[in-house]
């Protein structure tokens, strides 16, 4: 495969080409994907020998290059650093549909790297990378039960669209990524605007039709350039040893698994395992470490099989619940006195404390990535400390799992967040998982809903989330509501659904089997809705609506609209004016280019004072209006009166009174308050005022009247006569 070969098809109205044989030839498999003007190189490498351990060491990397969008990276070094959240989420998105398609017992290390070379914003580099990952694997000698493909699906005015453009995505009420094989779906990730279960299912199946076509396209590539798959040694337990361990432990393991409380159940299972392992240690076998490792693996498989058999055949779960039963719920708001909003949500032995923080819009998150989004004002972060599962370990920066769970919660809540116009705040939610026995990401969504309501955020509707599970033995399957950790670990599916009472706002599905049929998806969505509505009813019994007032410790933000041409007046030369307002009131001021002014402070009185100052600065004088101002300067020809901050006018000496005035000081003194009427604003914007226009004129006998002095105002600019 030394010569370049190109395979082309159409994808969502754009040309898709796969190039192999020219780049990254030392990798086990590599493909350059051209989708429109988006270009992504994916290379896959598999180790020749198994790696020690009882897991499959698969690593998926997605590398964003800033040159792909014509940008220079920020920061001092001016080069790409740690992956962005979007890159991390994309790597997870690719990993999830690929991982189930490696054989059970495969222990060779596999690494897949997708590098983004060029980005056309209307041609998703993420979907190109997913396709490239599949192609790189299927044409390599790495054993892989693909191909797979993934597509984005949108819905505009009821019509489904594959790989929507940026413009189409803005109009769509569904943002769905679905992946799978020709036969079945094995990964779903979605955000939505309260869509029905039926609409979401239709979107998933619509996407699967396109996935089938892309899988057929890859079969053509495999036929032309695919390598023969290498022979590998899968980890398989010794049949005699397996039978021996089963005979000694099956009954005890079944009893231990039925222990309802998590910690007690874990202790009971551990006791069974220790008893069996100790019996083999006592035999003092020659290859003891290898035997003990194999026995430990067999015991875990027995634990898995017994749990699955209990659920599938007896329809009983380890904690004694029915298959559609939700664990006991409890919740509380306002636990933390100084934060802006807090919510504690507990479901069984899973507990999340969510905190809402409000800030001025200037504190939004700046996005320096490959997409068109420049900033976001709503964030949800998820933290999972070791103590939440009763374990010790180092505390590191958020990993892929924490970033992924935080993003899922953010997607679930995004639709109900009020617009900037309705609520001009940056909103940050942090969910601290304090206990975990499954479904902690969904607990964080419920806790975040409580925290926002407690903070007074006017969300469109409360949102709740639930995690569904599946145990499938042959053609028989059992769908589980509100799965706990053990059911997640040994089950076949983790299907998370979040939404309001009116529809779905987020959905995420990962499976460990080849795929799911439409029937199973339909039943899982229906059962998830029942659970979601039950949880929503509980949440609204704790707090049914946003608090009417924000926390005393939250910034109070007032908006004011001014003419864009007045912005310079508010800012002043070198920022002098705006800094003076900030110094005087202690507020924070942000001004948008359209003239929207945001004023933020914990003290509403200072907010109002800042508003009054700005209103005075941008206020325009109108002829005929009456003002009360202070005398700021006196000249021989009249007095200058400050009408409001930044604007003054001249009361000519002849406009002070109806009778003749000899000296200005006879009527007005410096600092006097005087009520005046605007009689003229000249072409240069200078304001002429009159005091006498507001005074009653005294009647005089005809003979006593004296000729009036000539009125002198600011000179008007005379236009030159045209010749």
Curated annotation (Swiss-Prot):
The keyword Nucleotidyltransferase applies. Residues 692-723 are annotated as: Disordered. Residues 693-723 have a biased composition (Basic and acidic residues). Residues 624-692 form the S1 motif domain. Its EC number is 2.7.7.8. Its cofactor is Mg(2+). Belongs to the polyribonucleotide nucleotidyltransferase family. This is Polyribonucleotide nucleotidyltransferase. It comes from Listeria monocytogenes serovar 1/2a (strain ATCC BAA-679 / EGD-e).
């Amino acid at each position: 495969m030394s010569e370049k070969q190109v395979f082309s098809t159409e994808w969502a109205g754009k040309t898709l080409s796969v190039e192999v044989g020219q780049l990254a030839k030392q990798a086990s498999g590599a493909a350059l994907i051209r989708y429109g003007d988006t270009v992504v190189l994916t290379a896959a490498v598999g180790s020749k020998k198994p790696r020690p351990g009882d897991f499959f060491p698969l690593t998926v990397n997605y590398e964003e290059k800033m040159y792909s969008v014509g940008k220079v990276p920020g920061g001092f070094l001016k080069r790409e650093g740690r992956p962005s959240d979007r890159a991390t989420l994309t790597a997870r998105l690719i990993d999830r549909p690929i991982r189930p398609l490696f054989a059970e017992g495969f222990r060779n290390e596999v690494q897949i790297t997708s590098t983004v070379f060029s980005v056309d914003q209307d041609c998703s580099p993420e979907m190109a990378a997913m396709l490239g990952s599949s192609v790189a694997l299927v044409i390599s000698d790495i054993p892989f039960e693909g191909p797979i493909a993934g597509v984005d699906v949108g819905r505009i005015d009821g019509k489904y669209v594959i790989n929507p453009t940026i413009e189409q995505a803005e109009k769509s009420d569904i943002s769905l990524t679905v992946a799978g094989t020709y036969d079945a779906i094995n990964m779903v990730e979605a955000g939505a605007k309260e869509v029905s279960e039926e609409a979401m299912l239709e979107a998933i199946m619509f996407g699967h039709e396109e996935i089938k076509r892309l899988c057929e396209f890859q079969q053509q590539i495999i036929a032309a350039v695919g390598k023969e798959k290498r022979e590998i040694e899968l980890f398989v337990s010794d049949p005699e040893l397996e039978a021996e361990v089963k005979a000694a432990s099956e009954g005890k393991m079944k009893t231990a698994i039925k222990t309802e409380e998590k910690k007690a159940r874990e202790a009971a299972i551990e006791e069974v395992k220790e008893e069996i392992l100790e019996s083999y240690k006592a035999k003092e076998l020659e290859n003891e470490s290898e035997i003990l490792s194999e026995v430990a693996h067999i015991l875990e498989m027995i634990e898995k099989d017994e749990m699955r058999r209990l659920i599938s055949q007896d329809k009983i779960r380890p904690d004694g619940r029915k298959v559609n039963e939700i664990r006991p719920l409890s919740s509380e708001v306002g636990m933390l006195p100084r934060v802006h909003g807090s919510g504690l949500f507990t479901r069984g032995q899973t507990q999340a404390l969510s905190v809402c923080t409000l800030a001025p819009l200037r504190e939004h998150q700046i996005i320096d990535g490959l997409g068109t989004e420049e900033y976001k004002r709503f964030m949800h972060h998820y933290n999972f400390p070791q103590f939440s599962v009763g374990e010790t370990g180092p505390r590191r920066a958020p990993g892929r799992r924490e970033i992924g769970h935080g993003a899922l919660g953010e997607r679930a809540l995004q639709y109900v967040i009020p617009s900037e116009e309705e609520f001009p705040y940056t909103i940050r939610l942090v969910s601290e998982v304090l206990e975990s026995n499954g479904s902690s990401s969904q607990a964080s969504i419920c806790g975040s809903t409580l925290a926002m309501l407690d903070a007074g955020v006017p969300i469109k509707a409360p949102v709740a989330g639930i995690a569904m599970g599946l145990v499938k033995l042959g053609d028989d399957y059992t769908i589980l509501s509100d799965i706990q950790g053990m059911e997640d670990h040994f089950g076949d599916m983790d299907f998370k659904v979040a939404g309001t009472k009116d529809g779905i706002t987020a959905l995420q599905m990962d499976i460990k089997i080849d795929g799911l049929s439409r029937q199973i998806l339909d039943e899982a969505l229906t059962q998830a809705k029942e659970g979601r509505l039950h949880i929503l009813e509980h949440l609204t019994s704790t707090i049914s609506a946003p608090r009417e007032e924000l926390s005393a410790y939250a910034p109070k933000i007032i908006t004011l609209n001014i003419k864009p041409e007045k912005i310079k007046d508010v800012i002043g030369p070198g920022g002098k004016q705006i800094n003076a307002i900030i110094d005087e009131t202690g507020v924070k001021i942000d001004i948008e280019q359209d003239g929207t002014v945001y004023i933020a402070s914990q003290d509403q009185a200072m907010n109002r004072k800042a508003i009054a100052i700005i209103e005075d600065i941008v206020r325009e004088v109108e002829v005929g209006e009456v003002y009360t101002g202070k005398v700021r300067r006196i000249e021989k020809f009249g007095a200058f009166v400050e009408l409001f901050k930044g604007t003054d006018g001249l009361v000519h000496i002849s406009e002070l009174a109806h009778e003749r005035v000899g000296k200005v000081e006879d009527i007005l003194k410096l600092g006097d308050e005087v009520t005046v009427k605007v009689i003229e604003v000249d072409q240069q914007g200078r304001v002429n005022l009159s005091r006498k226009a507001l005074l009653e004129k005294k009647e005089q006998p005809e003979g006593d009247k004296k000729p009036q002095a000539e009125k002198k105002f600011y000179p008007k600019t005379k236009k030159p006569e045209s010749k």
